[in-house]
Amino acid sequence: MQGYLEQIKPSVGDAWRTDELYVKVGGNMKYLYALMYDETRFWIAQQVADTKYTANINPLFKEGKELTGKRPNTLISDGARNFNEGFKKEFFTVSNPRTRHIKHIRLQVDHNNNKMERFNGEVRDREKVMRGLKTVYTPILKGYQIYHNYMRSHEALNNKTPAEACGIKVEGENKWVSLIQNASAKNLGF
């Protein structure tokens, strides 16, 4: 199903957020890096790494560019060194328009990371119920990304899913079944 969904380009805007959160994998602490479109909360890409500040997150940003077909005009992060290095490698350009990296988050102004922190709490709540993940290669995180984007409606989006807010409509009473059927039909060439 993931391959099917990767062929659908979400209509995302120019402001993206990124952050990391720790997750327990096989009894060890790992870090889940996530990239999200600010306005609709569409979870664009993810990456699991062993370390927090030194992990190479270029693949996360590269996947985001490939999925959306663009780079953001603004990237909001907590300013960790690896976010800045990934930004320079994947998003920075000398030609205009240049992508701006907002890396100093403040609580009282527009440049906070509250949406991303709320998202982190959502993922952490799910992981806590599961008592951690068994392996880095688990399909649970990709499945949760699908659930977050295509199934879970958000009150702040007028009870739409992030995918619906990005122009992707999943028809049917049971969206899981619809996505599975669509992915199967695509793979069979119907």
Label each PLM-derived region with a short phrase.
Residues 1-14:
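Short, basic alpha-helical nucleic acid-contact segments in DNA-binding proteins
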Residues 11-25, 34-36:
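Two-metal-ion RNase H-like nuclease active-site motif
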Residues 19, 35, 41, 75-78, ...:
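Mobile genetic element proteins and their domesticated derivatives, centered on retroelements
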Residues 28, 83-89:
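A short acidic (Asp/Glu
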Residues 46-68:
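Active-site beta-loop-alpha junctions of metal-dependent nucleic acid enzymes
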Residues 71-83:
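Acidic/histidine-rich, metal-coordinating catalytic segments
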Residues 103-124:
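RNase H-like two-metal-ion nuclease catalytic core shared by retroviral integrases
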Residues 129-190:
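C-terminal domain-tail junction helix/linker
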